[in-house]
Amino acid sequence: MLLWSAVRGLSPPRIVPSLLVVVALAGLLPGLRSHGLQLSPTDSTTPDSQPSRERSIGDVTTAPPEVTPESRPVNRSVTEHGMKPRKAFPVLGIDYTHVRTPFEISLWILLACLMKIGFHVIPTISSIVPESCLLIVVGLLVGGLIKGVGEKPPFLQSEVFFLFLLPPIILDAGYFLPLRQFTENLGTILIFAVVGTLWNAFFLGGLMYAVCLVGGEQINNIGLLDNLLFGSIISAVDPVAVLAVFEEIHINELLHILVFGESLLNDAVTVVLYHLFEEFANYDHVGIVDIVLGFLSFFVVALGGVFVGVVYGVIAAFTSRFTAHIRVIEPLFVFLYSYMAYLSAELFHLSGIMALIASGVVMRPYVEANISHKSHTTIKYFLKMWSSVSETLIFIFLGVSTVAGSHHWNWTFVISTLLFCLIARVLGVLGLTWFINKFRIVKLTPKDQFIIAYGGLRGAIAFSLGYLLDKKHFPMCDLFLTAIITVIFFTVFVQGMTIRPLVDLLAVKKKQETKRSINEEIHTQFLDHLLTGIEDICGHYGHHHWKDKLNRFNKKYVKKCLIAGERSKEPQLIAFYHKMEMKQAIELVESGGMGKIPSAVSTVSMQNIHPKALPAERILPALSKDKEEEIRKILRNNLQKTRQRLRSYNRHTLVADPYEEAWNQMLLRRQKARQLEQKINNYLTVPAHKLDSPTMSRARIGSDPLAYEPKADLPVITIDPASPQSPESVDLVNEELKGKVLGLSREPRVAEEAAEEDEDGGIVMRPKEPSSPGTDDVFSPAPSDSPSSQRMQRCLSDPGPHPEPGEGEPFIPKGQ
């Protein structure tokens, strides 16, 4: 009745996922039997016995009489030739053992997918309880159900976790890592990951050793190395648990990258400490040399993993150069090379997580420049799908393994572990933050410190490392595993469920849902270049300086080797523009924005009487987040650098410095040529025949040849560039027009008539030898204040281009 009332209370959209879950659970039960599918008792017969059959005689069906061995007819042909009696052809057969493993794997994946659908169908539950908690509860229920029917629940094997479930999650996090935020906070992340993990391991291990000494007879035999090994396992922050919780609360980028980056980079410390204490536990005596070698192994494991990842990332980027004609296999290279990097690192006992992160970060910019847009979409969705399914299976198997595993409970040890984990985390974050804030420009506030300390969640990595312990060398491994599961459940359930209300209560800044505008991106890039220039001036080589060095090295050498064709040379903005135009055209055709074209040849189309389509309103496609992100990336990579701009500015400069960039010269020449043409048209009223005159590339200086031969009907004007500010330096060849032109300030109409009277002759102004005017003569105002006079003075006072060295004399002699 309770089940029926619960089903009646669900709406139709919610009943379907529930029924699918029940079907999946029902399918799991027969698959988990250790001996395969059991047949009915009638089917399990001995080879000598024959099944009872009925004989049909006419319309009457009779049962065969009981046949004794003496009365059984003998088939002489069989006995003579030694052949067995022929069996009937099997119409339907059952062989579950043949498909057992893939069938059970498919059922578990199906259960994980149905769980994710069911959680989002009921939004009230998912808004209160994190998804990771619900998945663990489902695992507990499934494990209890399997154990209740008398079967042994499956256990999360460490090899399955480290080789198949963990790599997709780390690859997804490394491939789509926010590189800018990660590099800007790399120092803080390394301090939390390395120093913080070491502090937690030794602090927790030392306190637990003290607890074991006074805790009683059950835990007195646990030594110091065993407790240090246990502390190294339980001290590491789990990236899977952090991703599952922090992505739901939408915390700001700084806190997210600090906690998540710590969970990624502390893998090297955890691996080194785990193998170090595991080896030391087998030694009778540990010397100083062993401790020094263990310290050096940390750098080997961390840097070796990074090196392996970089090598495979470069190989993947280089391979993608040659996939232009085989686009189908492009996503496969990303997955294979990344997974090979992880396996190669694990082969040499290096950090596989560091190798995956390094390979994803290195290969992404070059692979995306070589592959097609469809391949990029495939990589994105496949990684998200793969990591989501792996994360779901990990939490479900955590619950199932809790029911299936053997546990040893000790109140003193378990409660002390939980309490000291919280104390070590809080003290470590407070102490390290006090030191870090002395060097950070943006300080970590007390609210930020609380979220960082409260977000240190433990997960499946600690569980798998605890499961790997050998009972021969560590007899109390069941107690360790029980304490680890307790800490995992407390951090996931208690801290994971309460972190969202605490974030709202403390008013911690959350992540902005809207992307930054293009204007903000341009200003951010401008400030980066500005800070780089300031660092160069001050002589301080900060991260902006080294970032600029790496970008220059990347553009000059690396891109030419790893990016195919002209894509390494031409700006990505142009290629992206053509891509956007193509997408827009396709969207317009699909949306009906263009006239329909007949799909088949017909007489109507041949007669050209096809009715014209009505002018449909143009549908402007909305700018998606992916397109906007591509625009931002292109702007970040292709904005003009500050050092490549003009070295100096002068308002009298018409021709650019010949040592400047070619395109800067072109822009300056065109701009100054347009300004000069505008001045001539405005001041001298010379008709501009743009159709007959070629475009001026630059201003003519000194004795340069004319850009084109002047026409006969145009007045010829020659201006002395040496002393353009002196009206006496202009000599008119036609003496009759001299007085009329000089009297332009008094009678403009007379000057116009004079120009009309002598159109054939034109006006010729020849330079005279400049005199040596005084300061008062140079800066004295004109005698007339009429508009025409002022316009003439502005024309004659235009300095024009600077003359070449040796042409003309200086305006003011050196003696004055």
Swiss-Prot record:
Q: Where is this region: Interaction with PPP3CA?
A: 684-687, 715-720
Specify residue ranges for compositional bias: Polar residues: 37-50, 783-792
Q: For the site Channel pore-lining, which positions are given?
A: F161
Q: One GO molecular-function annotation for this sequence?
A: protein phosphatase 2B binding
From the UniProt entry, list the residue stretches annotated as the region PI(4,5)P2-binding region.
509-516, 552-560
Positions modified as Phosphothreonine?
A: T603
Ranges for region Interaction with TESC? 503-545, 633-816
The UniProt catalytic activity note for this protein reads: Na(+)(in) + H(+)(out) = Na(+)(out) + H(+)(in); Li(+)(out) + H(+)(in) = Li(+)(in) + H(+)(out); Li(+)(in) + Na(+)(out) = Li(+)(out) + Na(+)(in)
Glycosylation site list: N75
Share the record's PTM remark.
Ubiquitinated, leading to its degradation by the proteasome. Ubiquitination is reduced by CHP1.
Q: How does it sit in the membrane?
A: Multi-pass membrane protein
Q: Which controlled-vocabulary keywords does the entry list?
A: Antiport, Calmodulin-binding, Cell membrane, Glycoprotein, Ion transport, Lipoprotein, Membrane, Palmitate, Phosphoprotein, Sodium, Sodium transport, Transmembrane, Transmembrane helix, Transport, Ubl conjugation
Q: What Gene3D superfamilies does this protein map onto?
A: 6.10.140.1330, 6.10.250.1040, 6.10.250.2020
What this protein is called in its record is Sodium/hydrogen exchanger 1
Q: What is the lineage of its organism?
A: Eukaryota, Metazoa, Chordata, Craniata, Vertebrata
